[in-house]
């Protein structure tokens, strides 16, 4: 306690010499922090008698108050000086000639999303939205992917807790829409989805569009013609399209869709996978309270960045997210 006044004086001198906010904060920690030299004086109270402690405690608090007041005053001065310096540096010379504005443009992913939505809108599809933070039921269970199902491993899911996650696809929007209404349905569900993956063709966040049609007397032939027509209109040319048998828990039968994209070195057709599709599984209808004996449906899903890469000739998916103006200006 006998050197308290000296500590206060040292602190005030240090505050006065501080010429920037970082140095001032270091002084605050040194003198008033949890292990600060003035704060530590409180430990000496235990050595004093009960009669001496109140007065000693008051002195320590007054000492802390003095230094704290000086720090606050110095901080205000430094912040004011910083603002004045910045304003002086940013002063405008009104005699300089004017500069034209550099107009922006839509991001290529936004352009692609809008193009997809416009194509399906002409076919009578509505655009439905849903939450990006989903529950396990709508993201997996209601899509015929129970907890023990190995297909869950394909999704590389970001979990908040065992029952809450970032959606891995936009299919939950279809479930929520079917739960809230009655068939027939004709919808697309665009939006951001999340999976723990990152390389030249994958990012942890990307965009999907998933479509659903539920009506009476729907067949795989209807699905096939819808997909083929969409791809023809999107790429603005006739394409050879191939449907390969595949597996998705929420559709049966299921298929992967490939398009002809150039030629292999041996002259054979080079096929590129662009989307997945299938007939809605009866179990999914059961979860949504729809009679699968009366109604049938088909679903499809596609990656927006994937189609944007093909349409614009982009080789690396990550370029869409790097905010490089040299890249983005090409799409205005």
From Swiss-Prot:
Q: Which Pfam families match?
A: Phe_tRNA-synt_N, tRNA-synt_2d
Extract the CDD domains matched here.
PheRS_alpha_core
Could you say which EC number(s) this protein's record lists? 6.1.1.20
Q: Which cofactor does it need?
A: Mg(2+)
Q: Where's it found, cell-wise?
A: Cytoplasm
Record keywords, A-Z:
Aminoacyl-tRNA synthetase, ATP-binding, Cytoplasm, Ligase, Magnesium, Metal-binding, Nucleotide-binding, Protein biosynthesis
Q: Which Gene3D superfamilies match?
A: Bira Bifunctional Protein, Domain 2
Which biological processes are named by the entry's GO terms? phenylalanyl-tRNA aminoacylation
Instruction: Give the InterPro entries listed for this entry.
Output: aa-tRNA-synth_II, aa-tRNA-synth_II/BPL/LPL, Phe-tRNA-synth_IIc_asu, Phe-tRNA_ligase_II_N, Phe_tRNA_ligase_alpha1_bac, Phenylalanyl-tRNA_Synthase, tRNA-bd_arm
Q: How is the cofactor bound?
A: Binds 2 magnesium ions per tetramer.
**Reaction(s) this enzyme catalyzes, per UniProt:** tRNA(Phe) + L-phenylalanine + ATP = L-phenylalanyl-tRNA(Phe) + AMP + diphosphate + H(+)
Report the top EC class in one word.
ligase
Q: Name one GO molecular function term.
A: phenylalanine-tRNA ligase activity
The residues that hold Mg(2+) are: 252
Question: What top-level branch of life does the organism fall under?
Answer: Bacteria
Gene Ontology cellular component annotations, sorted alphabetically: cytoplasm
> What does the record note on quaternary structure?
Tetramer of two alpha and two beta subunits.
Q: Which PANTHER family match?
A: PHENYLALANINE--TRNA LIGASE, MITOCHONDRIAL, PHENYLALANYL-TRNA SYNTHETASE
Family to which the UniProt record says this protein belongs: Belongs to the class-II aminoacyl-tRNA synthetase family. Phe-tRNA synthetase alpha subunit type 1 subfamily.
Q: What is this protein called?
A: Phenylalanine--tRNA ligase alpha subunit
Whichever gene encodes this chain, its name is pheS
